[in-house]
Amino acid sequence: SRYRGRLKLPKETGDELLRVIVGRLNNSVSHEEASDALRTLATGLSPQAVSSTTFSALENLSRTIGCFSASLHFTERTHLAIEGEKSQVRLVLSAIHRRDLEQAIDHFRHYWTWDDDWFDIAHYIWIWSGGISGVKAFDIEPQWDALLRDKTVTILGPAETSLTKRSLKNESLVVRVIMQDVLAWDAHSDPLGGQCDLAYASRETRNWLRETNAWDQLEQFQVTSLRVDEGSELGSETASLRRAHDPRKLMLGGSSPNMIPLMAWDIMRVPGVTLTMGGTTFFASQEAYTAGNRRFKHTSGRATDETGSTGELFERCPTFARHNVLENLTLLANWVSEGAISADKPMTRVVALSPEAYMAELDTLYGIERR
């Protein structure tokens, strides 16, 4: 009843939602039955009567129990509800996440102001449109700018990649995510020969570094960028650290961006960067983490597998919901489709998928098996 009140759902709808969630958790309701029930619930809710934020919450709840394809029915109604609401910012974000560049440009032209809420949107559209629309809003940090301006940069994620050492141009910088037990890569087996010039660390990794005082392990990187909130201490006065820019304002459902789009966004805030990305399939692959990229999760004291899981029931699905995997994919798919950034073959395959095809893959890989 508490969640019914927060979501402002009719009692019958709330009861059915609870039945589906609990049933999926204890496996008394199959993935197919749960998906069908969620689709029926979505169809019965009017975008004129339910807020876009409620539809976003239902979208995320569906993904928490691994019903990714079914969640798209709530996604669709989120966008329909936004059309009837008064938020001009959310109208532009809706166009971005529907991959509609023309509509995004049109809304931006009519509505944008110099308010802080618009600057990230303005810069994103400027990159996406190749400078035709939007407003470039580089946030210059002198030392960071000196490292990256007019440079060729390769972001390599933890998944499989078609990139090799031959893919790297002279003086190309390689950027990776570091994690506990993943702070170096074997020069012989790694596709890029173990190169990593700039590192990024999530909040969880930063907490591990701080709790174990392992800052000296960052000396091999020119700079380590941390995902920390504004005003938070970085954690060390001796390591070369900086705070990464978070594209949270580009997310529609109030979700938290994944590290890969965060890295791309942060780097593309520097003028003149030529960015190539690889090793990221947005979890739409059998091996989201290759052998050299599987972390030890210090919060649980267990190692992770090729999915990033320690083996707990429904461990990955809630993470995908919290980060909103589809919105993360869309932010970079838009740029790849317009040639703003380049991608390796596995990433190119995934960003070309329709939302329906992408979610169907996540259903197969994670939802049906309750991973």
Where are these regions (language model features)?
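Metal-ion/cofactor- or nucleotide/acyl-coenzyme-handling active-site neighborhoods
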Residues: S1-R371
